[in-house]
UniProtKB/Swiss-Prot annotation:
Keywords: G-protein coupled receptor, Glycoprotein, Membrane, Receptor, Sensory transduction, Taste, Transducer, Transmembrane, Transmembrane helix. One of its GO terms (biological process) is detection of chemical stimulus involved in sensory perception of bitter taste. This is Taste receptor type 2 member 40. It comes from Gorilla gorilla gorilla (Western lowland gorilla). The gene is TAS2R40. Residues 1-14, 80-100, 163-190, 269-276 are extracellular. Glycans are attached at N170, N179.
């Protein structure tokens, strides 16, 4: 059975690494919590008032709510793993964190993939019968596809609670040339089971996201070249919007892939627990949902207007509280 074994002591992580990781990932998580929380509040309020949300807004509501939970959970895990290492390295606690992290990440990747597929079908133009069929059916099928995504994420996350991770703490490791002892944290990861369940849970949404993003970029690029050939000029607002959409889609396609890779590397314990590479994985995992949430707000006219109203109302509210 292929396993990865790692061990670490309290001396392996410096105060600088702890502070750096908590500050950087904390800023990312708080940014993501504010962004995802804002989107959830806007669309959640409309849904609570009995309004029927359009399909795109419904996907964004589910994506933002799951990201809100994910970023809160990631921040909690970072605090626990760095400041309360003995508690975190209890097998039941460690497995609980990993299973929920994978479930929330898989759900997020599925929802992000469906959002990209939906926008691709709405915006892109391709003369293919399958594309036209999906264009007509996507609104009807989307509620069922979102529910199926949650079920699939759960199905490939829960098995990670058995025969994948094993961690323990030995508090009686003797220190050479000293009469004292130190704590040592051991972890074992069954790579065969992890690779199987992780890849099964992420393979389909990853391919969907890459395919939808690529088709969207090609369609927008083709339309932009057509506009350029008609001498509309690079200053045309429509062309600028298309170029901006191409850049945003390209950036988040790359970040989406890096996030999936970072999640796997972090889960597999290939790197030492407190190594710089593992810290980098944590930062990437926190950066993607935070950055995408901000981009969703800035790229959506309705959310952008709501954010400006919110920014205007907060100082007025704080001023009223001080009176």
């Amino acid at each position: 059975m292929a396993t990865v074994n790692t061990d670490a002591t309290d001396k392996d992580i410096s105060k600088f690494k702890v502070t750096f990781t908590l500050v950087v990932s904390g800023i990312e998580c708080i940014t993501g919590i504010l962004g995802s929380g804002f989107i959830t509040a806007i669309y959640g309020a409309e849904w609570a008032r009995g309004k029927t949300l359009p399909t795109g807004d419904r996907i964004m509501l589910m994506l933002s709510f799951s990201r809100l939970l994910l970023q809160i959970w990631m921040m909690l895990e970072n605090i626990c793993s760095l400041l309360f290492r003995i508690v975190y390295n209890q097998n039941s606690v460690y497995i609980l964190f990993k299973v929920i992290t994978v479930f929330l990440n898989h759900s997020n990747l599925w929802f992000a993939a469906w959002l990209k597929v939906f926008y691709c079908l709405r915006i892109a133009n391709f003369n293919h019968p399958l594309f036209f069929l999906m264009k007509r059916k996507i609104i009807v099928l989307m509620p069922w596809l979102l529910r199926l995504s949650v079920s699939v994420s759960l199905s490939f996350s829960f098995p990670l609670s058995r025969d994948v991770f094993n961690v323990y703490v030995n508090s009686s490791i003797p220190i050479p040339s000293s009469n004292s002892t130190e704590k040592k944290y051991f972890s074992e990861t069954n790579m065969v089971n992890l690779v199987f369940f992780y890849n099964m849970g992420i393979f389909v949404p990853l391919i969907m996201f890459i395919l939808a993003a690529t088709l969207l970029i090609l369609s927008l690029k083709r339309h932009t070249l057509h506009m350029g050939s008609n001498a509309t000029g690079s200053r045309d607002p429509s062309m600028k919007a298309h170029i901006g959409a191409i850049k945003a889609t390209s950036y988040f396609l790359i970040l989406y892939i890096f996030n999936a890779i970072a999640l796997f590397l972090s889960m597999s314990n290939i790197f030492d627990t407190y190594s710089s590479w593992n810290i980098l994985c944590k930062i990437i995992m926190a950066a993607y949902p935070a950055g995408h949430s901000v981009q969703l707000i800035l790229g959506n006219p309705g959310l952008r207007r709501a954010w400006k109203r919110f920014q205007h109302q907060v100082p007025l509210y704080l001023k009223g509280q001080t009176l």
